[in-house]
UniProtKB/Swiss-Prot annotation:
InterPro entries registered for this protein in UniProt: Class_I_gatase-like (IPR029062), GATASE (IPR017926), GMP_synth_C (IPR001674), GMP_synth_GATase (IPR004739), GMP_synthase (IPR022955), GMPS_ATP_PPase_dom (IPR025777), NAD/GMP_synthase (IPR022310), Rossmann-like_a/b/a_fold (IPR014729)
PANTHER family, A to Z: GMP SYNTHASE [GLUTAMINE-HYDROLYZING], GMP SYNTHASE-RELATED
Provenance organism: Brachyspira hyodysenteriae (strain ATCC 49526 / WA1)
Keyword Ligase on entry: yes
Record: residues binding ATP: S225, G226, G227, V228, D229, S230, S231
Function (record text): Catalyzes the synthesis of GMP from XMP.
Domain GMPS ATP-PPase: start-end pairs: 198-389
The protein's name: GMP synthase [glutamine-hydrolyzing]
Active site: C84, H171, E173
Recorded metabolic or biological pathway in which this protein acts: Purine metabolism; GMP biosynthesis; GMP from XMP (L-Gln route): step 1/1
Gene Ontology terms, MF aspect: ATP binding; GMP synthase activity
Keyword field contains Nucleotide-binding: yes
Subunit structure: Homodimer.
Length: 514
């Protein structure tokens, strides 16, 4: 990462909201990174953070195996903000007392602010916050003073101005906390004196230079899928090394309608990228014949992709690097509480490449979130319909065709899915929804068309709202829009005579049907 920008170090104790803290800070144009709570003091000194934040977590600090920090952390002179468990670890480590609460506090609560300086600067007398804790602080360490309380939590926020340590028993990073961003702003800019010097324009400049220095005269191969991450990576890397980038686009016969044509048009024709297009649709469909089990479908597709990709990669000379669109959440997921030695997850398409293909990985986005990658895509003039494209499963339409996969059933689903996406866009809903798509079911139903009886396939429509795909709510789409989608599919797609709408949330259902 660039050395000339201010950085915030977030020590992770296992909170479900830790990534949200990072995102909130980056939205304020300050760079932040998450690392496990047990990183060494030497690592912290070398990282040179402008501020340190201790995240929440599910543990109780007084338990023997609870995550702890080196007490030297509090003597470094760096500003520290503890959130929820982070507050409790500060109190416990510095001589205060934490016990199981008589009354747990979950959900919204009203804090009374007793000190309107530091993190509560420009606040009113009270504020609604989001609590999530089963332990409470009974006494605070020497040098700390109370700055906020609730009816159930006498010590809801404390500070030690001399040591520049602040701690709060609630979550400012969640939307349920009113003025939560203001608390983070006060900490970053009034207390830590951070500069707003993290932006995608400077990242692009830095990364182009880094890619050139890293790659040298070697060629780079990238599996282009047409999705957001690989598309933006392709354009950024091409900007750095030009024709040294070789993109391999495999048509597995399970893509969205006309997707192969669109990918070739955008990347080969508009961006002049060296694109190798492989039509392996027959090969994939032959291998999938008679396969109905979802996991088996994934295995067959994964194996075939690796085989096709390998065949094409071997034809390219002087390859030194394999580029992937790995994102920061993948990295966090792999290294957080388990320690930095954990293996980083690989992209599903290339994770199984043979070991004799000794390429180094080139991952330009491994420190970025999806919204930051989209911002880069816009800066690089990628079409908005690619930048804001909804997530699409790696195995493609194979996991949206329940039962047998045939060329005919793929074409039926492509047409139905194209209608769903088209009408969702017309209604102005596409960017508001996490995903919206059609599923072809392995059942037929009786219908009537004109004077005749029909016995054709059933199509389900799925649309969900989500932030991170970990949880999702089914979208309450206007009945008129659903009616148009249903009528168009039944009238325009030969082979479907009934459309149903999926009203399942995640959990208990998953977003995809398989």
């Amino acid at each position: 990462m660039q050395n000339n920008i201010d950085k915030v170090l977030i020590l992770d104790f296992g909170s479900q909201f830790t990534q949200l803290i990072t995102r909130r800070i980056r939205e304020l144009n300050v760079y932040s990174e998450i690392h496990p709570f047990h990183v060494s003091i030497d690592f912290i000194k070398e990282f040179k953070p402008k501020a340190i934040i201790l995240s929440g977590g599910p543990s109780s600090v007084y338990e023997e195996d609870a995550p702890k920090v080196d007490k030297q952390l509090f003597e470094l002179g760096m500003p520290i903000l503890g959130i929820c468990y982070g507050m409790q670890i500060i109190v416990y480590s510095m001589g205060g007392k934490v016990e199981s609460a008589d009354k747990r506090e979950y959900g919204k609560a009203e804090i009374e602010i007793t000190n309107h300086e530091s993190i509560f600067k420009s606040f009113g007398k009270s504020n609604i916050v989001w609590m999530s804790h089963g332990d409470s602080i009974k006494s605070i360490p020497e040098g700390f003073e109370l700055i906020a309380k609730t009816p159930n939590t006498e010590l809801a926020a404390i500070e030690n101005k001399q040591k520049n340590i602040y701690a709060i028993q609630f979550h400012p990073e969640v939307v349920h906390t009113e003025n939560g961003i203001k608390i983070i702003e006060n900490f970053l800019f009034n207390i830590c004196k951070c500069e707003r010097n993290w932006n995608m324009g400077s990242f692009i400049e830095y990364e182009i230079k880094r890619i050139r220095e890293t790659v040298g005269d070697k060629n780079v191969i990238l599996g282009l899928s047409g999705g957001v991450d690989s598309s933006v990576a392709a354009v950024l890397i091409e900007k750095a090394i030009g024709k040294q980038l070789k993109c391999i686009f495999v048509n597995n016969g399970l893509l969205r309608k006309d997707e192969d044509k669109k990918v070739v048009e955008v990347f080969r024709d508009n961006f002049n990228i060296d694109l190798i297009y492989v039509d392996a649709s027959k090969r994939f469909l032959d291998k999938l014949a008679g396969v109905t089990d979802p996991e088996q479908k994934r295995k067959v597709i994964g194996h075939e992709f690796v085989s096709v990709f390998n065949d094409e990669a071997k034809k390219i000379e002087n390859v030194g690097f394999l580029a992937q669109g790995t994102l920061y959440p993948d990295v966090i997921e792999s290294v957080s509480l388990r320690g930095s030695s954990a293996v980083i997850k690989s992209h599903h398409n290339v994770g199984g490449l043979p070991k004799d293909m000794k390429f180094e990985l080139l991952e330009p986005f491994r420190e970025l979130f999806k919204d930051e990658v989209r911002e880069i895509g816009l800066e690089l003039k990628l079409p908005e319909d690619i930048v804001y494209r909804q997530p699409f499963p790696g195995p493609g339409l194979a996991v949206r065709i329940l039962g047998d996969i045939t060329e005919e059933r793929v074409k039926i689903l492509q047409e139905a899915d194209d209608i769903v996406v088209s009408e969702i866009k017309k209604a102005g809903l596409y960017r508001k929804l996490w995903q919206s798509f059609a599923i072809l079911l392995p059942v037929k139903s009786v219908g009537v068309m004109g004077d005749g009886r029909t016995y054709e396939q059933v199509c389900a429509v799925r649309a969900v709202e989500s932030v991170d795909a970990m949880t999702a709510d089914w979208a309450k789409i206007d009945y008129n829009v659903l009616g148009i989608i249903s009528n168009r599919i039944i009238n325009e797609v030969k082979g479907i005579n009934r459309v149903v709408y999926d009203i399942s949330s995640k959990p208990p259902a998953t977003i995809e049907w398989e």
